[in-house]
Amino acid sequence: MRNMASLSSSLVLLLAALILSPQVLADYEKPPIYKPPVYTPPVYKPPVEKPPVYKPPVYKPPVEKPPVYKPPVYKPPIYKPPVYKPPVEKPPVYKPPVYKPPVYKPPVYKPPIEKPPVYKPPVYKPPVYKPPVYKPPVYKPPVYKPPVEKPPVYKPPVYKPPVYKPPVYKPPVEKPPVYKPPVYKPPVYKPPVYKPPVEKPPIYKPPVYKPPIEKPPVYKPPVYKPPVYKPPVYKPPVKKPPIYKPPYPKYPPGSN
């Protein structure tokens, strides 16, 4: 009850205050009074220079993340029914015969190859000593052979026609020169023999005519060189480690 009485009294006081307030009691018939705006000059604040604050680099250790285990996902095999492709019949392609003219290949002259003689030094083989083998004499008794009497057989003379033998061509055999090491012979002293001077008449040699040799031009076909394929060289990317540059302050500390 006391609370209700206090609430009612407070409400009455509030209503009285609102009614008796000067805004409610103001006379609205009077025009408003003009008040010019008051100019407030701006206040000058000099700029404050703050020296740069040096913040050392913060070391952040690398965070190691454990590997995440992903169980294998089972994918059932997808059944693809076989696709029937009917056979394609291609008509035979007629290729007319290509005429290739005969290629003229001139004879290639191969000069004879001269091989120098191969020198093989004599190989020294020491004599092998073989001791004499003793063989006892074998006794053979004499065999008696009675004399055989053969009557003379008459052989008529046989006529043999002369056999024609064509000449056999034997190619010249080239024997490589045999190397004979020089044999040292001591000088033999021979007394000088006097030979009277012999006068030989001059021998006339007629000039020999050598006809000019005509050599046919040698045809050298152009040599085709196929292009050489050079596979691309793989150069792995070069990874340069990051260069750590410590942060420098914009102004040296203590300059202000």
From Swiss-Prot:
Keyword annotations of the record: Cell wall, Developmental protein, Repeat, Secreted, Signal
Region (Disordered): 233-256
Keyword set includes Secreted: yes
Gene Ontology terms: cellular component: extracellular region
Signal sequence annotation: 1-26
Keyword Kinase included in the entry's annotation: no
Region 44 X 5 AA tandem repeats of P-P-[VIY]-[EYKP]-[KT]: start-end pairs: 31-250
Sequence repeat start-end pairs: 31-35, 36-40, 41-45, 46-50, 51-55, 56-60, 61-65, 66-70, 71-75, 76-80, 81-85, 86-90, 91-95, 96-100, 101-105, 106-110, 111-115, 116-120, 121-125, 126-130, 131-135, 136-140, 141-145, 146-150, 151-155, 156-160, 161-165, 166-170, 171-175, 176-180, 181-185, 186-190, 191-195, 196-200, 201-205, 206-210, 211-215, 216-220, 221-225, 226-230, 231-235, 236-240, 241-245, 246-250
Subcellular location: Secreted, Cell wall
GO terms, molecular function: structural constituent of cell wall
Principal place of residence: secreted
Alphabetized PANTHER family for the sequence: PROLINE-RICH EXTENSIN-LIKE PROTEIN EPR1, REPETITIVE PROLINE-RICH CELL WALL PROTEIN 3
Function text: This is a developmentally regulated putative cell wall protein.
Membership in a protein family: Belongs to the plant proline-rich protein superfamily. ENOD12 family.
Designated name of the protein: Repetitive proline-rich cell wall protein 1
